[in-house]
């Protein structure tokens, strides 16, 4: 239905949607709430929404944490167009920008530093995609679904490469798939994140893993 009407609501924001992006899920509001609660306590935080898709997560953060400045990072040309449309639609052009970024590669030096990275990356194991419900498998972009053989490719890459744009005390917040929370927590711990938490979605499924960068490696 979202693709037919070309829009969807997320965290109270009406957003443009196309077949270049995933339809925003209520599960992702768990990640938005966790990030917003922390960011409201920071002074003028700089936030990166990596694998931004429609931009729903970063735009929700910008709308609810008025001091935040947000970069929407997305590789897909089609998704990047939707991000830019939604920045304008939400009236957030002063504090939100969109950039073409590849989460699987090290960040560009010109990006600068961030106080928080939020990411809802592709996390479906490649072999599970043929078995997805047809409404997802046949219409939503596989680029936004496929997380590699075990679904963890993007978590590994972000933990390995993107911690370099954070400083001690910065926060990393992930949405994760069913059964992935413990593995992602271990990945984060292995690269210097502490105060790690796993948060459930409204159905009680472990859905968010977050932590603060403690040390340089």
Segments (PLM) and residue ranges:
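Class I S-adenosylmethionine-dependent transferase superfamily signal
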Residues: 35, 61, 136, 158-162
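Conserved SAM/SAH cofactor-binding pocket of Class I
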Residues: 30-131
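Conserved beta-strand segments of alpha/beta enzyme cores
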Residues: 14, 69, 95-97, 194-197
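Short loop/edge segments at beta-strand edges and connector loops
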Residues: 5, 99-101, 176, 200
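Conserved AdoMet
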Residues: 1-38
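C-terminal beta-strand of the catalytic ATP-binding
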Residues: 123, 212-216
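Conserved Class I SAM-dependent methyltransferase catalytic core
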Residues: 149-213
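Mobile active-site "lid"/loop adjacent to the S-adenosyl-L-methionine
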Residues: 123-153
